[in-house]
């Protein structure tokens, strides 16, 4: 086995999930992530955790949804056995790495929507654990990224096997700015959007549950906007439910999407926005800071962390960003959309420029704006 797989497992178990002896650990393993699953199982055992490994293959998932569509039954009641498993878990690790990235593309849209809504209690139970999502490099993901398997493996491990403590220190500077700020203004040639972040808490996403960070790799700072107004364009693509979204533009009033368009995937975008009442509102503003991610791969776990990008999510807001007692935006979806900030862009907080053309004031690449 590639030694980097064992290193990946060690970072996941020790730095990210912080597994202790006696922890009940559920590991969900995609069909292409078997090797990482083996390495993680060994690491959990070495640390005294109690393991339950669950196969998470796209093929059976697709067949199940197709069967439910044919049976004309609803998803009103959450699956009690899955709920019980998650309620008993201390840690939930999701190891992605499917062999077909579009496996559920032909599932009827209304079935996908109903399934998402029906999973609400299960999703809440999973989010109540120390959960972490990561990905094992597979041939299908390499192909989706337009890379050879060897190049994609290097890309994944460059993003995962980082000096997380040093990156956490750098990102803490941005967290401090957002925590004390009131209004974020995003400006590009096609975007003019203002977001209220008053009384919000930004998350320094260090790839560790100790910092309310649940992705490996990570490397972003994110918060939950209280309000948003303006127009935003997303020039970086992503795939949702097997459909590619490109050239997305949203017009937002009082944090409600009132108009939308897309060069590709507009029907799927509309379907997502209609999932439930919260799906047409913004739940997240995220700023990528992981320089180990140097290209778009059409895998959101990596793409949203890429340095010199900004992303906004329609749907669910994360509780870690909200004041005590505030429910925030609820939804069955959380779909991130990405914008490239490397050229002709400016990000300000309360009128102060905190990022220009992708660079922060503490970086050498940051330059003063030319005089008019």
Label the predicted regions.
Residues 1-229, 370:
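Active-site bordering "gate/hinge" segments
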Residues 32, 98-100, 138, 200, ...:
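Short, glycine-/Ser/Thr-/acidic-enriched flexible segments
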Residues 41-46, 201, 248-251, 277, ...:
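Short, solvent-exposed amphipathic alpha-helical segments in soluble enzyme
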Residues 186, 251, 347:
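Short aromatic-centered micro-motifs
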Residues 216-260:
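Oxyanion-binding "anion nests"
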Residues 229, 245-247, 254-257, 280-284, ...:
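Active-site lining segments that contact anionic ligands and/or coordinate catalytic metals
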Residues 259-323:
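Dual-mode signal for accessory low-complexity, basic/Gly-rich regions
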Residues 298-370:
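Internal helix-turn-beta structural module
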């Amino acid at each position: 086995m590639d030694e980097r797989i064992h290193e990946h497992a060690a970072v996941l178990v020790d730095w990210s999930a912080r597994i202790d002896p006696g922890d009940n650990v559920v590991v969900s393993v995609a069909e292409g992530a078997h090797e990482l699953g083996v390495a993680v199982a060994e690491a959990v055992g070495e640390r005294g955790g109690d393991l339950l490994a669950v196969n998470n293959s796209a093929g059976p998932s697709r067949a199940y949804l197709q069967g439910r569509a044919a049976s004309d039954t609803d998803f009103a009641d959450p699956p009690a056995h899955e709920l019980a498993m998650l309620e008993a878990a201390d840690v939930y690790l999701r190891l992605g790495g499917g062999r077909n990235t579009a496996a559920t593309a032909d599932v009827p849209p209304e079935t996908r929507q109903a399934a998402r809504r029906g999973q609400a209690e299960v999703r809440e139970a999973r989010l109540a654990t120390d959960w972490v999502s990561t990905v094992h490099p597979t041939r299908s993901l390499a192909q989706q990224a337009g890379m050879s398997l060897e190049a994609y493996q290097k890309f994944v491990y460059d993003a995962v096997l980082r000096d997380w403590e040093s990156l956490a220190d750098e990102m803490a500077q941005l967290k401090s700015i957002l925590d004390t700020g009131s209004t974020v203004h995003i400006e590009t040639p096609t975007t003019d959007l203002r977001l209220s972040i008053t009384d919000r808490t930004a998350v320094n996403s260090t790839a560790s549950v100790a910092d309310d960070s649940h992705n490996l790799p990570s490397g972003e700072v994110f918060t939950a906007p209280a309000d948003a107004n303006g127009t935003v364009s997303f020039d970086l693509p992503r795939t949702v439910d097997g459909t590619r979204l490109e050239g997305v533009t949203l017009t937002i009033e009082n944090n409600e999407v009132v108009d939308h368009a897309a060069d590709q995937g507009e029907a799927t975008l509309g379907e997502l926005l209609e999932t439930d009442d919260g799906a047409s509102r913004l739940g997240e503003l995220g700023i990528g800071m992981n320089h180990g991610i140097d290209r778009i791969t059409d895998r959101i776990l990596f793409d949203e962390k890429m340095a010199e990008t900004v992303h906004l999510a329609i749907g669910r807001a994360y509780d870690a960003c909200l004041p005590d007692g505030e429910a925030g935006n609820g939804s069955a979806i959380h779909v991130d959309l990405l914008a490239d900030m490397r050229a002709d862009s400016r990000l300000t907080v309360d009128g102060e420029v905190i990022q220009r053309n992708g660079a922060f004031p503490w970086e050498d690449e940051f330059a003063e704006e030319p005089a008019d």
